[in-house]
């Protein structure tokens, strides 16, 4: 749950900052000057909602490097690092994408891919993964991450998050306007949004943001099945990915920051907020999927 919480808070924080800046610029007063202007509110919600998602996408790679302490392999220092870089290169070529940055981070078994663009992504694996898996299994995990990049999952999830952000911003302000109007009923001296509007907006942005995260996590779980199948296709065989998943099922997966959880190989523990399906479901789906 810690990973999911950070993922939600990162997105909510960006949207909240944009909302506060808009309030300071007088946008709320404009939207409610003569009753709630739903058309203008929808435009405002689209700008804030997709603005927050796009900003989160654009800063995803530097944020990943900072939060995980990943060490970029610019020049391999040993045989293992050289093998990792060459494996990423081979799989990226097969997938038809540009060579990603390659990195290693300390921690329990996990891996992730991130970045705003297919041809300038980052693929990183943990030291725990490298120590606990065979090279064939590691290659399958790397293939899973490369498949995320090739499938455009970072952009897809950002667009989904943008839609959900728009819903949150729009609905929270409609409800806040109604509550504020009820609280100030009969107060003809006041104009523009009151304190009730401000407080309700902030609270609902957070509450609805968590509800939206459940929807985003549901989409993420479906993308995981595609990435598993993508890894099998890149290697032209299913068994390495099946073996890697089975081994992960017997390990304690490492925690990733929530902002990148959907691009990791190991999932969270909460069913509603989990960005990854259960291991047994992923294995069964891969076994039944066409190669």
From Swiss-Prot:
Main location: membrane
Keywords in alphabetical order: Cell inner membrane, Cell membrane, Hydrolase, Membrane, Metal-binding, Metalloprotease, Protease, Transmembrane, Transmembrane helix, Zinc
Topology with respect to the bilayer: Multi-pass membrane protein
Keyword Cytoplasm: no
Enzyme class of the recorded protein, top EC level: hydrolase
UniProt-annotated binding residues for Zn(2+): 144, 148, 224
Family classification: Belongs to the peptidase M48B family.
Name of the featured protein: Protease HtpX homolog
Classification via Gene3D superfamilies: Metalloproteases ('zincins'), catalytic domain
Named cofactor requirement(s): Zn(2+)
Segments passing through the bilayer: 4-24, 39-59, 159-179, 199-219
GO-annotated cellular components: plasma membrane
Residue positions of the active site: 145
């Amino acid at each position: 749950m810690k990973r999911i919480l950070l993922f939600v808070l990162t997105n909510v924080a960006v949207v909240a900052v944009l909302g506060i800046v808009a309030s300071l610029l007088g946008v709320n007063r404009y939207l409610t000057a003569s009753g709630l202007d739903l058309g203008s509110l929808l435009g405002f919600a689209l700008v804030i909602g997709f603005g927050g998602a796009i900003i989160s996408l654009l800063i995803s790679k530097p944020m990943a490097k900072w939060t995980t302490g990943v060490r970029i392999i610019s020049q391999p220092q040993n045989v293992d690092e050289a093998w990792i870089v060459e494996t990423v290169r081979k799989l990226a070529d097969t997938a038809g994408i540009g060579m990603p940055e390659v990195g290693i981070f300390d921690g329990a078994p996990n891996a992730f891919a991130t970045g705003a663009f297919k041809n300038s992504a980052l693929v990183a694996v943990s030291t725990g993964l490298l120590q606990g898996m065979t090279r064939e299994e590691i290659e399958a995990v790397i293939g899973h991450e490369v498949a995320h990049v090739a499938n455009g999952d970072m952009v897809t999830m950002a667009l989904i998050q943008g839609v959900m952000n728009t819903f949150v911003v729009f609905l929270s302000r409609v409800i806040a306007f109604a509550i504020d109007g009820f609280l100030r009923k009969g107060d003809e001296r006041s104009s523009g949004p009151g304190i009730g509007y401000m407080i309700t907006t902030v609270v609902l942005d957070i509450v609805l943001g968590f509800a939206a995260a459940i929807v985003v996590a549901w989409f993420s779980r479906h993308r995981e099945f595609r990435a598993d199948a993508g890894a099998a296709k890149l290697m032209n065989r299913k068994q390495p990915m099946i073996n890697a998943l089975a081994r992960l099922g017997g390990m304690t997966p490492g925690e990733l920051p929530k902002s990148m959880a959907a691009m990791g190989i190991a999932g969270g523990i909460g069913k509603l907020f989990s960005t990854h399906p259960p291991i047994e479901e992923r294995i069964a789906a891969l076994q039944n999927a066409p190669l």
